[in-house]
Amino acid sequence: FGCYRLLPRGLLREPLAGLSRADTIILTRTDRVSRETRHEIHQACRRQTAPRELPWLETIHRPRELRAADGTIRPLTDLIGRSLFGFAGIGNPAPFQSLLEDQQADLVGFTSFADHHPYSADDVAMLSRQARAVGAELAVTTLKDLVKLPRDGLAGIPLVALVIGIEFTTNPAALEQQLAALQPGKSSP
């Protein structure tokens, strides 16, 4: 909710006034902020959308599985007890790093790149050196980054993406009702 901007947050995003077009409000990553902060955000949104009472939903990001560059799916349990080297070229890599730290593994190194980073051969060589230097058994990145990298990993260190899903922690039925109303032949609630 940085700078009172939406989708997701930041200076170049939807202004708070954009809530006037909303039918539902979904607050993401609620496990990363306090209950008080969530309440403040909820109240700010309610003021913006008054007198309408919009459904309010909260979500968390939850790791689902691992995906290799060749599309192979591996269970999250493959991380347990292993030494991981993580990296990401996304706008805010800290939550991704936190998700890796939350796994039952040892995150032995992490490197951040700028958002939308175009990985070069030199970058791959640097990542390979860093991962080997810290004794990583597995390199883990985002799906967004995985597609920009060689399919064979980092110089012998297997490379996977942590697949992250959204889990609704409050009122998922409200979203289901909103989506059902969009189906042909259905009317809005």
Predicted regions and their residues:
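A C-terminal functional module that forms or caps the active site or interfaces directly
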Residues: 93-154, 160
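Short, charged/polar "capping" segments at the starts of alpha-helices
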Residues: 32-41, 67, 94-95, 146-150
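Redox- and metal-dependent alpha/beta enzyme cores, enriched for Fe-S-associated oxidoreductases
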Residues: 72-73, 77-121, 176, 180-181, ...
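Short, conserved loop/helix-junction motifs that constitute active-site signature segments
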Residues: 16-21, 48-51, 78-80, 134, ...
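Short, charged, surface-exposed secondary-structure boundary motifs
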Residues: 1-10, 67-69, 118-121, 168-177
